[in-house]
Amino acid sequence: MVQTQTFQQATNGANTELESHNVKIGLEIHIPIKTKQKLFCDCPTNYYEISEPNVSVCPVCTGMPGIKPYPINSEGLESVVMLAKLLNCKINEKIFVKRKHYNYPDLPSGYQRTSEPLGVDGNLNNIGIWEVHIEEDPGKYDLNYKRVDYNR
């Protein structure tokens, strides 16, 4: 059973500092989607079955110079649109993918491909869902071996 409370119930109606500022709390939730290939190349996604790092990589997913943009994986896109519909979102008809530039060791290209919102203004159990996106998963930094695995 899931119990929910309003802010008033949780604070016993006390006039708190948070209440006087009309605080809203947001969560960013990342959910891996199961597809046969990565979102922006044809590399397989069976990396959970592979123990060796960096065997499921190519010039496209590592962002090598001269590589042209690759279309988004339709299987992954369909999964995320289905999720947005389940969350009662309005679905955007056009899909735009942008590059968010970061200087992290788990992003060999120096950018992460992420969509503009695919779904907006949804709700689940009276909890507002602002927007739903799809984005590529960066590599996984392994602290034990001091290496990055780009199989993801």
Each model region followed by its residue ranges:
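Basic, nucleic-acid-interacting segments
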Residues: 2-152
